[in-house]
Amino acid sequence: MTQSQVTPNAREALTETIVDAKVRKNLTFEAINEGTGLSLAYTTAALLGQHALPEKAAKLVAERLGLDDDAVRLLQTIPVRGSIPGGVPTDPTVYRFYEMVQVYGSTLKALVHEKFGDGIISAINFKLDIQKVPDPEGGERAVITLNGKYLPTKPF
């Protein structure tokens, strides 16, 4: 039976254990995810406390990380989502995403509504991908794809 968390505490503690094991074993999220049948972004989000993993994937990642049966069980629970506490994020990487939404949020909203009509882009029926590509001017660029299902507002 699927179980749900009612506070973020247990999953936050598990996330600390997972990150510690990842560092101790010198693993990448990609290596941990291998063989799960899930996307790298989904598994990483689950390991960071934002999604539940199917039983097979939970057992596989737990084995790679050296986690116990309690961790396997907890990885399968539906978490209390949201990893950024109230207020403006202070982590520089997370803040840049916050800044992007501050600058481009109204533009994204206007263009989504213009192209699709009144509605939202789902973060539930959603895929995320990040690619590292060369920058023609030198260095590297991040290409981040947010792929969510459009859900129209339905008058009632």
From Swiss-Prot:
Keywords of this entry: Lyase
Gene3D superfamilies xrefs: Cyanate lyase, C-terminal domain (3.30.1160.10), lambda repressor-like DNA-binding domains (1.10.260.40)
GO MF: cyanate hydratase activity; DNA binding
Catalytic residues in the record: 96, 99, 122
InterPro entries associated with the record: Cyanase, Cyanate_lyase_C, Cyanate_lyase_C_sf, CYNS_N, Lambda_DNA-bd_dom_sf
The protein's Enzyme Commission number: 4.2.1.104
UniProt GO BP: cyanate metabolic process
Top-level division of the source organism's lineage: Bacteria
EC main group: lyase
Reactions mediated catalytically: cyanate + hydrogencarbonate + 3 H(+) = NH4(+) + 2 CO2
Family that this chain belongs to: Belongs to the cyanase family.
Role: Catalyzes the reaction of cyanate with bicarbonate to produce ammonia and carbon dioxide.
Annotated protein name in UniProt: Cyanate hydratase
Gene giving rise to this polypeptide: cynS
